[in-house]
Amino acid sequence: MTESTVAIVGSGIVGTTMAYHLANQGIDVEVFEKGPEYPYPHDRQFREKILYLYDNPAYRLPQDLQHLTLSGDYQRDLNSERIMVVGGSATVWQAITLRMLPQDFKTRSLYGYGDDWPLAYDDLEPYYGKAEALLGVSGTDADNPFAPRRSSPYPLPEFALSYDDAIFAERLRQHGIVLHTTPQARTRAAYEARPGCMNFGTCRVCPIGARYSPNYHLLRAIETGRCRVHSNTSVRRLVVDATGRARALVYQRNDEATPREHGAEVIIVAAGALESTRLLLLSASERHPDGLGNDGGHVGQHLTLHHLWSGSLHYKEHFQPGRFGGYTARSHQFLDPPNRGKHGGVVVDFSSQLFANNVVFHTDVPEHRRTGLQVVEVLNARRQWRDIVMQAESTPGPQKYVARSTQRDRFGDPYLHVKYEATALDHETYRFGRELFDRVMAATGADEGKFASTKHFTSGHHHMGTCRMGHGVRDSVVDQFGKIHGTPNLFVVGGSNFVSPGAVNPTLTMVALAIRTTEYMVDRLL
């Protein structure tokens, strides 16, 4: 059996954040990642995905290693939202880095729905600043009257509104709606060893490292000599000793037939809300027959997704979208609306981006018959359309959960089954989002609009709540630092800890929680 001081399951933005901080404290860390290596900087992926529209199978796991079953309202391919590579999902994210509101941490006390977190915004606020510094966030609150208080400035200045966003901001202002800039982990100027953004407009696959990728800090953790990464390695279960302490993890190389054990003083599970839940359920034993951390029955329960409903607006004039890099404009005016409690909060999100696959495939002409002229016609038509997204919070419910599937992977371990049915408050939030879409359409002078139906939403790859934090076994899986109740050296950290999702993108909160937990470990356990 091999050993280390700390073992981390998952190399995504949470696991990497913790590995980087621990390694720089002189602590030995072993990181186990189910997926393959993912080169950094991502210039190779840029050439493949953007220039050649090639989805390289070398960066995908086969179905007998990455799969889930799904039932309920969610009509998207939830499995494809889990990017299992070294670096995780934040290797291909949009880098939107937003703070939750203080109100988001106490929706039960303030509005009568959901549950309150065991910590407050003020407890997390200093760590939001540390997370922004780590990721190199460009932003300002000067144009956003709805931003929560902060004790430290953004490390980089904001990206100005794009040409089309500036036009919309003025039209919306005249109708009482504030459009402001978007904080994002994309470098407005050179930052540390990362160059300033060159506005390629392909933020999900940034070839130069201007858009933050966890691999940036994972490489630096490895350079300390204190961090080692095991790619293409599945962690199959966790082992707890007779005293209740986590003793080891059982892992297996994806191409090998024999499992092995790795012992550690502290084990951290940071594999995303879905896969972290699966690992706890697979770790059932005589001591924990329903799964590790599941003595109160909360593992896999309280699942929430963000509900993103997309719309398009058509105008007589040309707005020239796609001329200014990534996202620049949004409105947080409706994050904490007057009737919150009757419905949830909503982010009004504008996108000025154009994607290669939208241009090439945004036509009914068979692919083999497309000409350059047909592609130009598609581009011309796109100049008169603007995309808009209503990104909404959701609430936990009895029909939102993760459990073991009846189907099994190549090792014989059950896959996940995800059940997701919207709650009554979710449906009311859709109606509120639709009203906002109609307001924006009228205020900006659109002559046509299209908006998704209530069931046609995407999660934004935001999966939360399945190992939520709380005060004890009766209401949660972990405490406010991610430590599993009753298992003093086992932590689950990430979006799975969220008690409620709010409406803003969760990544900055996840990183802030990771930094806070790492400091707790160094002070108390290591």
Task: For every predicted segment, state its role.
Residues 500-519:
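A conserved FAD-binding loop/helix module that cradles the flavin
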Residues 51-144, 398:
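Redox-cofactor-proximal catalytic regions of oxidoreductases
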Residues 61, 69-70, 110-234, 458-459:
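Conserved redox-cofactor binding core of oxidoreductases
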